[in-house]
Amino acid sequence: MAQGRSCVHPQCSTHSRLHWTQINGTRLVFSMNPAPRRAPIILYLHGGPGDACIPLTMRYNAALERDFRFINLDQRGSGLSYHPFAPDEAVTIDSMVEDVRQFVLGLLRGYGQDSLILIGHSWGSVLGLEMVKRYPSLVRCYIGLGQVVSMHAALRLRQNWAQQHLGPRIGSIVSGESGAADIVLMINELLSRGGAAMLFGSMGRIMAYLRSPYYNWPRLLNHAKGVSQSRARLDAELEQVDFSGQTSFGAPVYFISGRYDRHLPGSLVERFADGLKSPHRFIRFERSGHCPQWDEPERFAATVKAICL
């Protein structure tokens, strides 16, 4: 495991540094703050596929470092873990879940703990909920942000909404997983949440990458390549994901959904949560879109602390 330097930009209050580890034949980079050995561990799984976000959690979620060991893992082939996928390299949901499992086991061994807190956002919520399904003993609790429940159902709702409000042409664009769909939905979420003010606010997320001590232009290019290759390998499988038949989990699950989330409508998540027989809770953030952890970071930090401490 190797350390990098901490974020020194004046708008960053993070104490996290970069580390790396070797998992299943690939080098994975992650951020982690110094913390007491017995501090509760949070592992954050980014969205995408491939949309690594260490600069964003450093900028917006550093408040969690006061009470937790907060770790954000750049997944295989993504962000600072970028490498070109080999033609025969296994890049599937199963292989990505196995990467996460091996990473979790290493953390728990290293810090003498039995389980940790998982946070999964969007695509990362697929990996997170699969971890809870398959390995509940490793998960103290799970928090899903922009949770994937049934991609088929989400895409139908997304298309119907877009055709009604934006017209048939836009409806066809957002009916599948693609970069174009993400852009259309993101712009609409921003406008719905307050128009120009929110749009200018979103520039802060772009600046988080441009000002990060860990990103330069070649690494930004690699980030884009990581998104592209991850989508090419995983989007088709992602569109088949369906947790709607699951009625219980072996660890408590919490779902945070933004009122204006056009990517993965909260109505599906709330209905899914209502049908669970195991411990769960659905939480709606009224001022958020698809990224409640960055749209309302103060409320997000307070909510995580209330759930986990």
Model-based region annotation:
Residues 95-115:
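Conserved acidic catalytic loop of the alpha/beta-hydrolase fold
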Residues 64-83:
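Conserved alpha/beta-hydrolase
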Residues 139-179:
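A catalytic-pocket lid/entrance helix-loop region that shapes and gates access to the active site
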Residues 163-251:
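Alpha/beta-hydrolase
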Residues 50-61:
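The serine-hydrolase catalytic nucleophile loop
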Residues 288-297, 301:
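Catalytic histidine-centered segment of alpha/beta-hydrolase-like enzymes
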Residues 114-156:
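Conserved hydrolase catalytic core segment
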Residues 262-268:
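Conserved alpha/beta-hydrolase "acid-adjacent" motif
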